[in-house]
């Protein structure tokens, strides 16, 4: 239906942005903030009528500049890619938690149907933050294969071999998924209000240091 009563706001006191609008007689609000304590972006979508939130969420990059989209369970998708030869691998995950209704993963989408409220959690990571751990994993993999001719080729190519690159990419994705899942589990283990309160408290320790007027 048509959208009306559309408003956008940025609250500098809380470091949160929100949007409100009406559609088909239902009033919706969407609030988003980047939480340093939770290490993730949190988005809350609410309405004033039960069971009226239906949405599809996905990641996109220009010209499909990513390697693929995986799933973690039925409520989380992970977009992943790399920056080319000798570059870092990256991944970003999206988790949906719905009060009422249902959440399912269809292809590259998370689909929420008939919810009262939806909280989305966005977490990103790259192998720059876990270089040593990835190197250790690859060293162990090569050690396991060192007796084979293929392993010898991998070592001699020092990362230029296609098989090595594939193996390293798979290891990087596994590592990044695990790191992001820990962050998502911690965030989802708290209520939305707890996450918001912790975010505001952390932010105001910096924001409230200075007060000036013009």
Kindly label every feature range from the protein language model.
Residues 1-214:
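Aromatic-residue-lined binding/catalytic grooves and analogous aromatic/hydrophobic interfacial grooves
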